Amino acid sequence: MIRGIIEASRRRGFAPAASWPGEERRDLISSAHAIKSRGQIPIIAEIKPKALGRPLTEEEVFAYARAYADSNACAISVLTEPSNFLGSLENAAIARKAGLPVLRKDFIFDLRQLSEVQADLVLLIAALGVDLDRFIEAARERGMEPLLEVHTEEEMDAALKTDAEIIGINNRNLNTLEVDLNTFERLAPLAKQAGVFLVAESGVHSREDALRMMRAGADAMLVGSELMGRPEKLRDLNRI
């Protein structure tokens, strides 16, 4: 799957570098701590058109972003990959109007992609085999904090050798698409020892799943499919 997405992206080409206003970056870690201090689970709520099987209109994107903000999400994740996930760069810009930190979620393999749209955070996937240090530095130069995603022990080891402050453990195997919450539970202790901010990704469908990830050491979790079509469910998921 990954190879096909990258090849499609190469054929599509890259968007021109965006002109970014001089806005301060919205900080995920501070936002998550604020949510937790209110007795709630910090959730990065995702706008994932593929879960509905169709692209979203601009009005729908903003409605989701506003609903997530009203339900106390700590941030909004936006899929920007168009071919497989039906996302767009415009969706990230629209979601940012809701006032929360926005994570651009895509398959970033070329430095030029980091200039395509303004976001507060950007997903960097260790499995893509890019120069992590170089991409982390480039993301920060563009005003974005990287969320470095791993799925295996080897990827975690590589991530911990960088100065990434936020590491996401994806419970989904990107090759098989199988999901196993044990992945987070197995890898989390390695990251917690290093003192990084830890995000659990994929597989959270219930409040019980969310609490399980928190007990395993998650500082926040990313939830996508479960909220599409029913963003109000966030109020149930984030209750401690």
Regions found by a protein language model. Give the residues of each.
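An N-cap/entry alpha-helix motif that binds or orients negatively charged groups
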Residues: 1-56
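Conserved, mostly hydrophobic/aromatic
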Residues: 5, 45, 68, 76, ...
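N-terminal active-site wall of soluble small-molecule enzyme domains
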Residues: 42, 53-140, 147, 155, ...
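Active-site beta-loop-alpha junctions enriched in small/polar residues
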Residues: 48-52, 81, 107, 127, ...
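Glycine-rich phosphate-binding active-site loops on the catalytic face of alpha/beta enzymes
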Residues: 74, 78-80, 120-133, 169-176, ...
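Catalytic cores of alpha/beta
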Residues: 102, 109-120, 151-163, 194-223, ...
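Catalytic-face loop-and-helix region of soluble metabolic enzyme cores
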Residues: 166-209
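C-terminal helical cap(s) of enzyme catalytic domains, especially alpha/beta-barrels
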Residues: 181-191, 214, 227-240
